[in-house]
Design a protein with these regions (language model features):
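N-terminal leader/targeting segments and the immediate start of mature chains
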Residues: 4-62, 72, 187-193
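Flexible, processing/modification-adjacent segments and terminal tails
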Residues: 29-30, 38-42, 74, 87-145
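An acidic-aromatic
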Residues: 54-109, 176
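Preference for bulky hydrophobic residues occupying beta-strand positions
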Residues: 38-40, 55, 78, 87, ...
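Gly/Pro-enriched, hydrophobic low-complexity segments
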Residues: 66, 124-193
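Extended beta-sheet lipid-handling architectures
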Residues: 35-38, 50, 78-82, 167-168, ...
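Solvent-exposed loop/turn segments connecting transmembrane beta-strands
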Residues: 45-48, 70-74, 146-147, 173-175
Length: 193
């Protein structure tokens, strides 16, 4: 009987949210939007791609991601709306096709991480330092439309739940990392620094 009670108690926490995780994710679930900058890197076929990106994220609205560096592509913007993406440079616009949850591009890294915080299924939660800063580390699952396993892991600073780092893994391989350099919710002046 005691074993059954222990098993039933454990069942409630698998994939569910503890109070700490729910508290950390609540500002993201309730936000009207946020602005962030991050150093994003992608490793593919042994080659590393890195860029500084600025993202103006609007849940269920128009999200804009702009390349800040490297200089050779600075100013290129991606506009993401309802699963569609368009690349823009100055006054030119090029349809970039559908953003598939299985085919995550570096330009979609920051919006994907915010979406994961808002809607992903919590798999792991713990406390962990990131570069000597106490953080809540959350790993959430957003299984793709074609059943691909997409896991997003975020390190949120404990004192204010601001993201410091994010990683996106597809089918067990980390494909994108983001080191946040600034972050603020709409209507606040709360930089990450």
């Amino acid at each position: 009987m005691m074993t059954l009670c222990l098993l039933l108690t454990a069942c409630g926490t698998t994939g569910g949210e503890t109070e700490g995780a729910a508290e950390a994710r609540m500002p993201y679930r309730n936000m009207t939007g946020c602005v962030m900058e991050a150093e994003v890197s992608c490793t593919q076929d042994g080659a590393v791609w890195e860029a500084a990106l600025r993202c103006d994220y609007v849940p269920e609205g128009e999200t804009t991601v702009e390349v800040l560096s490297p200089e050779t592509i600075a100013g290129v913007k991606a506009v993401l709306t309802d699963g569609e993406a368009a690349l823009m440079y100055e006054d030119q616009c090029l349809n970039a096709g559908t953003v598939s949850s299985q085919d995550i591009s570096p330009m979609a890294c920051l919006p994907q991480l915010m979406s994961a915080l808002r809607d992903g299924w919590l798999l792991e939660e713990n406390t962990e330092d990131w570069q000597e800063t106490p953080c809540v580390r959350l790993t959430v699952d957003q299984t793709g439309a074609q059943d691909g396993k997409i896991l997003s892991t975020l390190w949120l600073r404990q004192e204010d739940c601001v993201p410091l780092r994010g990683e996106i893994a597809v089918d067990g391989e980390i494909i994108l990392t983001a080191d946040f350099t600034s972050f603020s919710f709409y209507g606040t002046i709360q930089d990450q620094e």
